[in-house]
Amino acid sequence: MSILTLSLSLMACGDSSWWSKDEPTLKSDQIKRTLPPRVNQREAWGKDIFDITQQLGIPQTKENICSIVAVVDQESNFVADPQVPGLGEKAVKEVQDRLDEKFKDKLGDAIGGTVAGYFQDVLKNQPNPKDNYLGQMRRVKTERELDELYREIFDYMSKHYHVSALTGAAKLVGQDIGEKLNPITTLGSMQVHIGYAKEHKRQGGNIAELRTDLYSQYGGLYYGIHRLMMYPADYDKAIYRFADYNSGMYSSRNAAFQSMLNDLTVAELELDGDLLLYNKDGSIRSVSSQSERELISVFARNNILVTPRQIRTDLKKEKEKKFEDTATYRAVTKLYEEKTGKKPIYAIMPEVVISGPKLSRDYNTNWFATRVNGRYQSCMQRAKRIKI
C-alpha cells in the first residue's frame, strides 16, 4: 500500500471526501478477529465498532479498524468500565492535598474557599459519620463509581448546605456547580473528554445522562471513534494520529510547524503543538505565545508581508485542517524550504507531559503514541490473516 493511500485511509471528514474509495473493508464478524485474543465479548465489541463506523461514514479498512482497536486496547483493554488500581486512595489523597486549591482555581478565592469548606464537612460527616463519603471514596474501584460518588456528594450539598453560597457559585461559573467541580473529565473505554462529548452529542439528555452513556460500551466507543477519526490530516504514519489523540487535534502537525520555526530563529520553542496560549476552559488567551512572537519577528526580518493581526487570525485555526491554507503556514513552509533546502516537515512527535490522579507516574505523548502504535502493528498482523 502506498503512503498516500495509507494517509488517506486514516483521514475523515463529514462528506467522506478524504477517504480512499478503493480499499476492501471488513465485516462485523471479521472485525472481531482483529481484537486481541484476551478480549471478552469479542462479537459485541466487533459489532459495535462496525455499527459506529458505519454510522459515522468511516470505511472499515484494516488500517482504520486497527487504529480504533489500538486506542481502545491502550485506554481500557476493551473493558467498558475498567478498574483502576489504587483509584480510591489516590482520589482521597487528591482531595486531602489539593481540595482548597482546586476549588479556588475553579470558583475564585472568595467563593472557592467557602465551598471547599462545605465539601470537606460533607465528606467527613455525610451521609453519616460511620460510613461517610470519604470512606466510600476509598472503596471505589472504577472511574464510574468515583464519578457517580462525586455527583451524589454535590447533589447532597445543593440540597442541604448553604444554598445561597452554592447558588452564587453556580451563577459565577454559569453552569451546574457539580459538573464544574467534578474531577472526572475523561471517561469511558476510550477516555474521551466530557467537553468533546458535549460538543458532539449523539442524542438528547442532560450532562448526567451523557456521562452514563460514555460509560456504556457503545457510548464510550462512539465518542472515542469520533474523536480519533473524524478529522482530516495528511499524516503518513498512524502514530501521529495516536499522538493527536493524546495531546490534541493537529498537535503533531503543529509541533512540526514549531520545529520549522525553530530553524528560522535563534529561539528554542517548546514543541508542544500549541501555537497559542489557552485558559483551562479551552478559550484563547489574549497574551501572545512564544510561537506567535517568533512568527512576528521572523516575518519582519525576512520582509514577509503578513501582519501581526493576520498571524493571530491564522493561528486561531491551529486546531483545524484549514490552518494549512493560511498565509502564516504557507509563509513558514516556503521560508523553511528556501533557508534550509529541505522539504517542509508535516508532522513530528509533540513533546507533551501527561499527568493525573489515574496515572501511577507522569508520562509523555511519545510514550502513549508508541504504546498505541505497538498495539496497532499487532492488530495489523492479525488483520493480514483475514481474507477480504
Model region roles, listed by residue range:
Residues 8-388:
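Cell-wall glycan-active module
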